[in-house]
């Protein structure tokens, strides 16, 4: 088992969201130019206000990819009836570039976990060609990554990474006596 896959299995990303796959492309997700997403690490929602920079490896500029960011734990991990909640989708990303070169078909929505610890998953799929994804999903709630990728003829995932986030508590004021 590869070291890229093991944390995805332990974190139940493979199983709950994605099927087993063999990573074949490098993907680096960075928030605020210095916070790199690592599997299973926790990030504060205040760091996630702006969409991340997502750098894609690959062999050449003639390969195109679709990036999907989703929350499989919405609205809460104990009752994820909105599984999966779609936070962002970018298609037609050329290999060896980053997501800013693609076509954003679902705008980035800041993660706002209310209850419990949520997993936020970035999954990258190789397209058969440019403009493989013809339409945006009708809703963000109850999105199904596997069904979507199958419908548009996308590959199995070629890369994935996830982080955890939970609601930030407000600073408590000390009582004045």
Curated annotation (Swiss-Prot):
Example GO biological process: flower development
Superkingdom classification of source: Eukaryota
Keywords: Cytoplasm
Entry annotated with the keyword Transmembrane helix: no
GO cellular component annotations of the record: cytoplasm
Keyword presence, rRNA processing: no
Pfam families to which the protein is assigned, alphabetical: PBP
Subcellular compartments: Cytoplasm
Functional note: May form complexes with phosphorylated ligands by interfering with kinases and their effectors.
Family per record: Belongs to the phosphatidylethanolamine-binding protein family.
Protein name: Protein BROTHER of FT and TFL 1
Species per Swiss-Prot/TrEMBL record: Arabidopsis thaliana (Mouse-ear cress)
Taxonomic lineage of the native organism: Eukaryota, Viridiplantae, Streptophyta, Embryophyta, Tracheophyta
Gene name as annotated: BFT
């Amino acid at each position: 088992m590869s070291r890229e896959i093991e944390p995805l299995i332990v974190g139940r990303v493979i199983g709950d969201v994605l099927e087993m796959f063999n990573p074949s492309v490098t993907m680096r997700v960075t928030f605020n130019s210095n916070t790199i997403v690592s599997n299973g690490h926790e990030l504060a929602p205040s760091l996630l206000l702006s969409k991340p920079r997502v750098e894609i490896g690959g062999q050449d500029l003639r390969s195109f990819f679709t990036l999907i960011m989703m929350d499989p734990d919405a609205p809460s991990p104990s009752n994820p009836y909105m599984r999966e909640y779609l936070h962002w989708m970018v298609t037609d990303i050329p290999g060896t570039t980053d997501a800013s070169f693609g076509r954003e078909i679902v705008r980035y929505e800041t993660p706002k976990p209310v209850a419990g610890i949520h997993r936020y998953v970035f999954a990258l799929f190789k397209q058969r060609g440019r403009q493989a994804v013809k339409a945006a999903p009708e809703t963000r709630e109850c999105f199904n990554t596997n069904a979507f990728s199958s419908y548009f003829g996308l590959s199995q995932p070629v890369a994935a990474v996830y982080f955890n986030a939970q609601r930030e508590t407000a600073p408590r004021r000390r009582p004045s006596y």
